[in-house]
Amino acid sequence: MRYLTAGESHGQALTAIIEGIPAGLTLSAELINKELKRRQGGYGRGARMRIESDRVHISSGVRHGKTTGAPITLTIQNKDHQKWLDIMAVEAVEEQIKLKRKITHPRPGHADLVGGIKYRFDDLRNALERSSARETAMRVAVGAVAKVVLTELGIETANHVLVFGGIEVAVPEAMPFTDIKKAAEASDLSIVNPKQEATIKAHIDQVKKEGDTLGGIIETIIHGLPAGLGSYVQWDRKLDAKIAQAVLSINAFKGVEFGMGFDMGYQKGSQVMDEIIWHETSGYSRRTNRLGGFEAGMTTGQPIVVKGVMKPIPTLYKPLMSVDTETHEPYKATVERSDPTALPAAGVVMENVVATVITKEILEQFPSDNMTDLKQAFFAYCDYVHHF
């Protein structure tokens, strides 16, 4: 499985082509749209979410509600594009139009300046448009397709916010996966402790008044995977490494960890490793899951627990100082439309990005031309692991 996305923040549309999805998978635009709606929710989202109501169009690879094994083409129209027809025109335009929304005041923390340097842009909008988090809408759409495959194999995914703008969420110890998923999806903050919602919302509102933004830490959990996905034989085949790269590819994500993560640096080995146990009915398992479901780049059969840290959104309504790229004079950075926080939406993006990596790994490890062969091979392997 592989895919590419294309499109700009204020361009005509976002597009993706996905190759490698097995034939015979039940798939509809409505299934994908449900996931896109999750991305657009969450407390703290701004005006664009009222402008855009993302709906995907499938133009290839699906016939009569079933995938054909051919490349799947997805398109999401940008409704906001109608206000940017001349500025984002594909055809050549007059110089006066080019100057309309030209950006020469790069925003600290964004791709504006470095992208302009790399690609020799005199208008930094070219870097801004493609590097925008708007692109993550299409990665959620791709992830939605991947999650349909995972569901057929009995694999579930969830995400929730652990730290919201410096406020740690009190997660009940040993909270079951199903409870985490249910609680987070019921919360417009994507947290599992409803008692903290009022405090966090007040914090968001105050930060918004100050023209500032908030970051945080998000946890994604994958439940139902067997032991042995991934490999230790080469560095680039380690599944946790692939997930780490994917998480860090999400806009504004600056760190990733599995299980106990960086806390392991403060512990002894006996406080970190997951003891192995065996039972005649359930096979091998672990007493704990401190390593987050991975050993040597391979799944252990425990839930995958991966955390990502998202920096505060760098577009500030109280902008930081910058420099005009034409005059080199100090200026306050350009202000583009932004939100005080996008953590709940980022959690949906992270969940779908991780789901895509997991699906890709499964499709590479098992026969995957069609869903019948995939399911037979996958469940046969799960049975083998169970009786090892």
Swiss-Prot record:
Known EC number: 4.2.3.5
Pathway(s) the chain acts in: Metabolic intermediate biosynthesis; chorismate biosynthesis; chorismate from D-erythrose 4-phosphate and phosphoenolpyruvate: step 7/7
Upper lineage: Bacteria, Bacillati, Bacillota, Bacilli, Lactobacillales
Residues the entry annotates as binding NADP(+): R39, R45
CC terms in the record's Gene Ontology section: cytosol
Family: Belongs to the chorismate synthase family.
Binding site for FMN: R130, S131, S132, N251, A252, A296, K311, P312, I313, P314, T315, R337
Name used for this protein in its record: Chorismate synthase
Reaction catalyzed: 5-O-(1-carboxyvinyl)-3-phosphoshikimate = chorismate + phosphate
Subunit structure: Homotetramer.
